[in-house]
Structure formats: structure tokens, C-alpha cells
Design a protein with these regions (language model features):
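Acidic, glycine-rich A-domain
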Residues: 1-210
Length: 210
């Protein structure tokens, strides 16, 4: 085959849309239990950050993305911003965070979901997606019933605002865990132990950003 001398688009790739219509908020649980390994391998926090790094890279030029790690307890919650919506998309901030962020204390997911939803609701993009990467029942509450009720209320409020809420779950897929997550999130759950998880992500992303 031959390339004309005056060809100007030999190595040109198709440019992303000039206007991004989607905003993503990745909310990562960095509570103490996330420091435990999965099947003797890397910690759940490391795996969650690796998942977020894949999403961060895939969404470059397609969506505005904010990434936050959270922990806390009954009376205090800390949010660590890994990447803000309008920061330059250079390198991988999630990969950098792997050596800078450690598992902390408890997690009060309902509070953090509300804070993320308020932030995301201010965006002007047509689609607004909140992904919660966590490993189980929030520990920053006085009881399991209180934890489940608070998360469910926060998720329902976010959905009423027009946000799509998707939990990515880093825990064993037991009947008990599935039931607890279903009571909190009701739908759209992705378990990180799924063999076809990457395929699920790919299909999900293509569906969400179209």
C-alpha cells in the first residue's frame, strides 16, 4: 500500500466530542477493612484504586471525573480529593494515590454519598453518575439497621436528583452480603469478584456515555 505525500491524517485518531455530556464521581471507601487483602492478594483499597485508575483512563476526553477517598466514624468524616472535575487529565492520579493513601478508620457511607450527590448535582452535564467503591456494611454507625437505612435514604435522595448511583462491591458474594447491599442500593450492583467484571465495566461505560 502507499501513502500520498500530501496526506495529513495518517496518524490522526478520531477526536472525542467537543462537549462532554457526562460527569462521573468515584467515591472510594478507605476504611480500615479496605486494608485487608482479597484472597491473600492485594488489599481491597489497592484493588479499588486500580479499578478507579482504569475508569479514570477510560473516561479521559469523554467525561468530567472527580475521585474522592473517604473514611471516618460516628462523629467525623474525612474526604480526600484524588482528582477534581476540572483538573488536567495528565497521568493517573489514582495510580499516584496508591502510594499516598492508606486505609483509615470507619466509614459512614450515607454521609459521604450525600456530600458527593450535592457536589455532582451542581454539574451542568446531561448525565451524572456516582460510583461507590466499598467492601461492605458501613462501620461508622451504632447499628447495622441504622447503617442500611442511612445509606438507602442517601441513595434514594441522590436518584431523585437524577443521579445514577452504582455500587462496586469488594467483598465475598454471600447471600447475606448480597441481601444487605440490595437493601442499601436496590439495583445496579457490580461485584468485584466477578470473572467478567472488566466486560461488565466496558458495557456499562459505553452505555452510560453514549
Amino acid at each position: 500500500w502507499k501513502i500520498p505525500l500530501d496526506a495529513k491524517d495518517v496518524f490522526r485518531r478520531k477526536a472525542p466530542p467537543s462537549k462532554r455530556e457526562t460527569a462521573f464521581y468515584l467515591l472510594i471507601d478507605r476504611s480500615g477493612s479496605m486494608g485487608a487483602g482479597i484472597g491473600g492478594g492485594n488489599s481491597k483499597l489497592f484493588t479499588a484504586l486500580a479499578t478507579a485508575a482504569v475508569l479514570e483512563e477510560a473516561l479521559k476526553g469523554i467525561a468530567y471525573t472527580k475521585i474522592v477517598a473517604f473514611d471516618g466514624g460516628t462523629n467525623a468524616v474525612e474526604h480526600c480529593v484524588i482528582k477534581d472535575f476540572d483538573q488536567k487529565e495528565i497521568g493517573s492520579r489514582c495510580m499516584d494515590a496508591m502510594t499516598q493513601i492508606a486505609a483509615g478508620n470507619g466509614n459512614k457511607d450515607g454521609y459521604s454519598i450525600r456530600a458527593a450527590a450535592l457536589d455532582l448535582a451542581k454539574r451542568t452535564e446531561r448525565r451524572k453518575i456516582l460510583m461507590v467503591l466499598s467492601d461492605g456494611l458501613p462501620s461508622g454507625y451504632f447499628s447495622e439497621a441504622e447503617a442500611i437505612d442511612d445509606v438507602r435514604t442517601a441513595v434514594q435522595a441522590a436518584r431523585r436528583r437524577g443521579l445514577l448511583v452504582i455500587p462496586i462491591i469488594y467483598t465475598a458474594r454471600t447471600d447475606e452480603n448480597v441481601d444487605a447491599y440490595r437493601r442499601m442500593y436496590e439495583k445496579s450492583m457490580i461485584f468485584a469478584d466477578s470473572v467478567g467484571m472488566l466486560g461488565e465495566f466496558e458495557r456499562l461505560l459505553m452505555k452510560l456515555v453514549r
